[in-house]
Amino acid sequence: MQIPFLHKRKRGKKPSAAAAAARAVDKARYDGTLIARGLTKSYRSRRVVNGVSLVVRRGEAVGLLGPNGAGKTTCFYMITGLVPVDEGSIEINGNDVTTMPMYRRARLGVGYLPQEASIFRGLTVEDNIRAVLEVHDENVDRRESKLNDLLGEFSITHLRKSPAIALSGGERRRLEIARALATDPTFMLLDEPFAGVDPISVADIQALVRHLTSRGIGVLITDHNVRETLGLIDRAYIIHAGEVLTHGRANDIVTNPDVRRLYLGDNFSL
């Protein structure tokens, strides 16, 4: 799949009204999309990501997969804002966020859930969510209403007064996602959500991701647990040697001979 590139504006000349209108139309065209174009990253003389392009749309779950050392994690971290981009661009809803820090990307609709526990351990469940709401909404009544809605939506109302440190793994993940949704993100970036969890928690996380997409949120997942991820996503990009080897739906990925030879192995099945 080819990703269309936006035309770059020449410097020096003030844009005409027609040109400004054309750019507004072009920006609207990309509303509801997260687009990475030609991402490239080198460390010293080694190029670890070489021209990776991908698209995530609202309401779909997309996997970013590949063998160890393929460059998928570096690519994912460039999209989150944790790693600077050497070449290429990243756009959220038509806004160029390539050089923006994480907090500015968050304001434009990007939520990020790291692999490590990110709860505020010294706070209760409700205060974990309230702390985020206080930053994003000055209206107390509206904050409390949204807090109650999120607690109910993720079935943790009965835990609202519990210390966050006492939660189980599945409860903690529900709290983390509920807290991330307090900012009303358009996209969620999930880093290794299936790492080190038991089978019951795997099913719980899969249900949570499906819930996010049903909300109209686009989800980008990177994970080493291939079977669990492929069983959940709408599409996947397979990264090998720093480049996109192929992309498509799960069945297309699994039956691709290059993917089986270089990544999944001959005996892999969903």
Curated annotation (Swiss-Prot):
ABC transporter domain segment(s): 34-266
Arranged from A to Z, the UniProt key words for this protein are: ATP-binding, Nucleotide-binding, Transport
Q: Name one GO cellular component term.
A: ATP-binding cassette (ABC) transporter complex
* SUPFAM superfamilies associated with the record: P-loop containing nucleoside triphosphate hydrolases (SSF52540)
Q: Which GO terms describe its biological process?
A: transmembrane transport
The protein's GO terms of the molecular function aspect are: ATP binding; ATP hydrolysis activity
Give the family this protein belongs to, as stated in its UniProt record: Belongs to the ABC transporter superfamily.
Protein name according to UniProt: Uncharacterized ABC transporter ATP-binding protein R00382
Source organism per UniProt: Rhizobium meliloti (strain 1021)
